Amino acid sequence: MSRYRGPRLRITRRLGDLPGLTRKAAKRSYPPGQHGQARRKRSEYAIRLEEKQKLRFNYGVSERQLVRYVKKARAQEGSTGTNLLKLLENRLDNVCFRLGFGPTVPGARQLVNHGHVTVNGRVTDIASYQCKPGDVIAIRERKCSKKLAEANLEFPGLANVPSHLELDKSKLSAKVTARCEREWVALEINELLVVEYYSRKV
């Protein structure tokens, strides 16, 4: 399954607030469609599927990518759910979004893919790059690159920069000072349900 490129508010009406997908708020609180307002009892599978979809749409990853992240999270020590969230939070496109360089995760991914971002002084156009403590993420020294980032920093998607990221707005650069902690994940998600969803599939 490829990345979603359709109407974003349609997704947030169904799944709730997804700060990484869009900064717009849905006018209607019920799911789209003819029977959107009807209250139906959801199965346990449907609830787990919904949590999984939240994760996929918020971070803009494909189903295949998410399966890979689940496998990596399982192989690491500690809670699989927490490990999964940390892997997604440490993606370069998400870090650029959390810093305010991009208005959303898709917007930040475009910055990365178009070569506007450097990691440790080298242009890095791989959105899935895993940022680690000590990495310096900066906007490339080009007029067009700086203009894009400065415009986005005026109206960041999220108000607060996580404590593990040290942002220098004047230099349009930031340093990863520590590993991301669970409390700095901006998405309201029950990651255990995601792990349960994949328990028989992966």
UniProtKB/Swiss-Prot annotation:
Keyword Ribosomal protein part of the UniProt annotation: yes
Any GO molecular function: rRNA binding
One of the record's GO cellular component terms: small ribosomal subunit
Pfam family, one: Ribosomal_S4
Cited SUPFAM superfamilies: Alpha-L RNA-binding motif (SSF55174)
Record region (Disordered): 15-42
Keywords carried by this UniProt record: Ribonucleoprotein, Ribosomal protein, RNA-binding, rRNA-binding
GO biological process: ribosomal small subunit biogenesis; translation
Keyword Ribosomal protein attached: yes
CDD domains, per database record: S4
Domain S4 RNA-binding: 90-152
Annotated InterPro entries: Ribosomal_uS4 (IPR022801), Ribosomal_uS4_bac-type (IPR005709), Ribosomal_uS4_CS (IPR018079), Ribosomal_uS4_N (IPR001912), S4_RNA-bd (IPR002942), S4_RNA-bd_sf (IPR036986)
Stated family: Belongs to the universal ribosomal protein uS4 family.
Assembly with partners or alone: Part of the 30S ribosomal subunit. Contacts protein S5. The interaction surface between S4 and S5 is involved in control of translational fidelity.
Role this protein plays: One of the primary rRNA binding proteins, it binds directly to 16S rRNA where it nucleates assembly of the body of the 30S subunit. With S5 and S12 plays an important role in translational accuracy.
Family matches, as PANTHER family: 30S 40S RIBOSOMAL PROTEIN, SMALL RIBOSOMAL SUBUNIT PROTEIN US4M
Name of the protein described by the UniProt record: Small ribosomal subunit protein uS4
Organism listed in the record: Synechococcus sp. (strain CC9605)
